[in-house]
Amino acid sequence: MAALVSTVSSIIRWNSNNNNNNNFTRSVKSCLSSNYHNNNNIIHNKTVLMSTNNNNNNNQKNSSRRSANYQPPLWQFDYVQSLSSPFKDEAYVKRVEKLKEEVRVMVKRAREEEKPLSQLELIDVLQRLGISYHFEDEINDILKHIYNNNNVYNTNNNVYANSLEFRLLRQHGYPVSQEIFSTCKDERGNFMVCTNDIKGMLSLYEASFYLVENEDGILEETREKTKKYLEEYIIMIMEKQQSLLDQNNNNYDYDYDYELVSHALELPLHWRMLRLESRWFIDVYEKRLDMNPTLLTLAKLDFNIVQSIYQDDLKHVFSWWESTDMGKKLEFARDRTMVNFLWTVGVAFEPHFKSFRRMITKVNALITVIDDIYDVYGTLDELELFTNAVERWDISAMDGLPEYMKTCFLALYNFINDLPFDVLKGEEGLHIIKFLQKSWADLCKSYLREARWYYNGYTPSFEEYIENAWISISGPVILSHLYFFVVNPNKENALLSTCFDGYPTIIRHSSMILRLKDDMGTSTDELKRGDVPKSIQCKMYEDGISEEEARQRIKLLISETWKLINKDYINLDDDDDGGDDYSPMFYKSNNINKAFIEMCLNLGRMAHCIYQYGDGHGIQDRQTKDHVLSLLIHPIPLTQ
């Protein structure tokens, strides 16, 4: 297992100084299993055999159309247009402004009192309640002061305090070292954690998910031990509750720590969708004994007001979808406008990203339809024509397409060329459109490659699959669009300058998380209807292992990819010696700004949210429906 951990990251490590995909291909040579080289000859023989056996069926496949039998959308146009919210009322807006000023005074007072632990705890609560975006300047001022003065660092043997500092500083891009835990270790270097210190163990567990690639230290080893203790704590509490129920005694006390621990063991805080986490935490925080009523009221009101903005966004994107006629003319494709919008809330929930959410919902809708054309409906000959049309980006390229493809191509063509000129303004506009068109061409070419694999009955090696799959998952298309929406394209040309050479590593890493989580949640259903083998099946076939073992290796790969994402925004090699002017690397960068980096992280988090229990995008499972209801439809009841 240790050897596996040391080699797994090579599969997803790209050279940031050279975006040539050949480097990526070579880096994948070190695979997840030691069986790879032993099975290599067998693998190639099996592949050829499979190709030979399926060649006779190619013509039949090429002329037939598959059907995924997707369910109709749960959320209809008329229902969405009927949504209304009382929280648009100016009285609520004024009340929120008043509460914000009260909280701002609270934060400033905490800064002046010079109690670092209290400051960190306040920041943590503000973040988890979903209202920290109102106080970014004040929070950054506190964290900068704590980092430059090592305030909590000197707290002797306080695992909780040091873990909280480590997590919050790294979350905000500060290159804090694991040496912060030196006061919490014994002479052998082991953490001195009391098994009864649930708060400390939970804080340590959550902090361990902010490690970066190749970072030495005891924190990751401690994660498994801490997880074991936390699991034992959960069992103990459950047994205690069951014992009381057996005695017909329902008067057991609410356990705040139990709620946090069980939640963290399901999925760590660092990997959770921010807005959904806030909705959950508001309910949990309300039951806390030391709950602050001002913070709670602000969180509830702010959530409901922002939800009313989401409902306006929904009306807009549902109207756009109706205007394209794709839902009516392309009945084979998934009509998932609501879920497509839910993705955008996960990537950027703040109200001022309203235009972004509307744009990316349209991108998501187009991706979903085009994906179904390649995966389900189109013949190989038709897919070749469509790919060529997108590459040419010429309206005359529509002439050779079948009618259903013309509908989709025209919607895509008009969308890209009609992007708001307040975004693509100046002379850069034309170049940006060219880059966005290229990202769509890259996506279609990756789809076509997978279609060829399917029609030829070919099972790719794991490295061959991954080399193509991080693009075919559509992450680069989504992140390319949002990049030019959140930065000034006339000033920040980092992505544009490399658009014909590759993508920044953070786009690749975020897309990798999206790909692997998608495969974990959808591969079984996709294979049933007929699709190319996904990462799980490629590992099973290549290494001769069970599906369960392959899934465990993919989970490990996801964890290693998160370390690469962490490294993209936490610069542990930063030689800045601190001082009053120190800021995290993404504040100083002239290349990629903070908002874009956070959105890349959030796309990975959304992948965990949508695919945690299966295919939450395509199948419309209960969890996704509950997410829609709690985030977009139902306001939080206010305490009278």
From Swiss-Prot:
Its EC number is 4.2.3.228. Mg(2+) 3 binds at D518, T522, E526. The keyword Cell inner membrane does not apply. GO terms for molecular function: magnesium ion binding; terpene synthase activity. Residues 1-95 form a transit peptide. (2E)-geranyl diphosphate binds at R334, D371, D375, R515, D518. Its cofactor is Mg(2+). Residues 50-69 are annotated as: Disordered. InterPro entries: Isoprenoid_synthase_dom_sf, Terpene_cyclase-like_1_C, Terpene_cyclase_plant_C1, Terpene_synth_N, Terpene_synth_N_sf, Terpene_synthase-like, Terpene_synthase_metal-bd, Terpenoid_cyclase/PrenylTrfase. Pathway: Secondary metabolite biosynthesis; terpenoid biosynthesis. Pfam families: Terpene_synth, Terpene_synth_C. It is found in: Plastid, Chloroplast. Its main location: plastid. Keywords: Chloroplast, Lyase, Magnesium, Metal-binding, Plastid, Transit peptide. It comes from the Eukaryota. It is an enzyme of class 4 (lyase). Mg(2+) 2 binds at D371, D375. Binds 3 Mg(2+) ions per subunit. Involved in monoterpene (C10) olefins biosynthesis, constituants of cannabinoids and terpenoids-rich resins. Catalyzes mainly the conversion of (2E)-geranyl diphosphate to (Z)-beta-ocimene. The Asp-Asp-Xaa-Xaa-Asp/Glu (DDXXD/E) motif is important for the catalytic activity, presumably through binding to Mg(2+). Monomer. Belongs to the terpene synthase family. This is (Z)-beta-ocimene synthase TPS13PK, chloroplastic. It comes from Cannabis sativa. The gene is TPS13PK.
